Design a protein with these regions (language model features):
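Glycine-rich flexible loops
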Residues: 2-245
């Protein structure tokens, strides 16, 4: 979701939302931080290219260990900026306590949800929110996405549950989302809205989102023809040293 409130934003000459006095420092990002921002921008545009998002849908964040006076922070995409017009300087750095540390634009409206997931799971290093078609079909039906493809069970690590619909812009929603996902599965569906995927890297979180969308399509098509075989993560015997596809 990418809506913004007129009560808290103004619009820049480029047509982008700008915080009123709430922006953090505009210090030039470090080389490592800039590389993280470039990776986020790449996967934002890739999400549109492969059909996971459209227009300004979705958002991405990455954990920055120790970036806030020794505590973790995150860098997150801004609110309501098209990915083809976004630059690395548009992204916002926020402490896990919600303090904006760097950035001239407003962070994604779903920032509180990202923060709750990072707080619950220290293993999570990146979050990808998408609004893809087949995930949303199953989400609108309130139907859990069971793994029927290898990539789904390898990356998501189990069935992906569906939350009942509600607005996803507050910490209470974030806590419920993180609780439903749990500690062993790496995705959750927001009913009538989209998917939130996590990973130990942005590359992995993106692969989770791709795998769940592909699986959702196959699950729908296979269910129309019969009863698909559901895979169980614990039953998959991955050979030692094997690399994930």
């Amino acid at each position: 979701m990418t809506t913004t409130s007129d009560a808290t934003t103004t619009t820049s000459e480029a047509g982008r939302p700008v915080g009123r006095g709430a922006a953090g420092s505009t210090t030039e990002p470090s080389r490592a931080d800039r590389a993280t921002r470039e990776e986020i921008l790449y996967y934002c545009r890739e999400s549109v290219r492969v059909g996971l998002n459209f227009n300004t849908q979705g958002n991405i964040s990455v954990r920055l260990p120790g970036a806030h006076d020794g505590a973790d922070a995150i860098v997150i995409t801004p609110s309501d900026v098209r990915y083809d017009a976004m630059s690395v300087d548009d992204m916002v750095v926020v402490g896990l306590d919600g303090t904006v540390l760097e950035g001239d634009l407003l962070p994604s409206t779903e920032l509180p949800v990202h923060l709750e997931h990072y707080r619950r799971r220290p293993d999570v290093q990146a979050i990808v929110h998408t609004e893809s078609t087949f995930v949303n079909v199953l989400g609108a039906l309130g139907r859990r996405i069971d793994p029927v493809l290898l990539n789904m069970v390898l990356y998501a690590k189990g069935p992906v549950e569906v939350m009942p619909f509600e607005f996803s812009t507050n910490a209470d929603f974030g806590r419920r989302s993180a609780e439903l996902m749990g500690d062993d599965v790496d995705a959750v569906v927001w009913g009538n809205h989209g998917l939130l995927a996590v990973g130990t890297s942005l590359k992995l979180a993106f692969k989770v989102a791709v795998a769940v969308e592909e699986n959702a399509e196959v699950l729908l098509r296979a269910s129309a023809a019969g009863t698909p075989k559901v895979l169980v993560y614990a039953d998959i015997d991955v050979p030692e040293g094997a690399r994930l596809p």
